[in-house]
Amino acid sequence: FSQDFSDKTSGWGAHAEAGYYVIPNFSVGAFISYHTNNKYIDRQTLPVSSTSAITSDQQHSIFQLPFGAAFRYNVAPESQFQPYAGVQLGASYSEMSTYMNVMKVYDRNWGFYVSPEIGMTMYFTPQKQIGLHVAAYYNYATNKGEVLSYSIDGLNNWGIRLGLAF
């Protein structure tokens, strides 16, 4: 949202999460994700200092790697259809990059990460060995970075996850 550096929709990412139910409705676990957003910028001239400038087209890229603790409240733990609400908290590594022909300018940074989500796991059999997982989420990270004349102050995304649960 409101991110001019790299604001295009992207499917380049993955998410893994594992948890343990400490009580029947509440689980605690860990997660790791990665995601990349890219945006093409037409040729333009950018001032680098008071006496120099760069003229080039650019490919902006923001790579994000959040990881940390995952918490989930399961509404119906005994059912084959298990709706839940959850939150993930942790650290977020990111790399903000601008590619210009044969040159790359980048800023690597760290921030705090939070991601609330709602979802459902639908098991194929009553034994709950394997199922389909779907979730909607929003995430925010406090990462800050600068590349050339561009800057970011916080990263946020929303998305939908579709995967397998076992």
What are these model-predicted stretches?
Residues 12, 65, 81, 112-114, ...:
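Exposed loop/turn and edge beta-strand positions of beta-sandwich/beta-sheet ligand-binding modules
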Residues 1-23, 27-28, 165:
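Short glycine/proline- and aromatic-enriched beta-strand/turn motifs that initiate or cap beta-hairpins
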Residues 25-28, 79-81, 125-130:
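Repeated loop/turn-to-beta-strand initiation elements of outer-membrane beta-barrel proteins
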Residues 20, 73-75, 120-124, 140, ...:
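Residue-level signature of outer-membrane beta-barrel architecture
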Residues 70-103:
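Surface-exposed, polar helix/loop patches in the mature regions of secreted/periplasmic/lumenal proteins
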Residues 16-18, 30-32, 67-69, 83-89, ...:
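Membrane-embedded beta-strand positions of outer-membrane beta-barrel proteins
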Residues 68, 154-166:
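Outer-membrane beta-barrel "beta-signal"
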Residues 1-7, 33-64, 91-110, 142-158:
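Flexible, solvent-exposed loop segments that connect beta-strands
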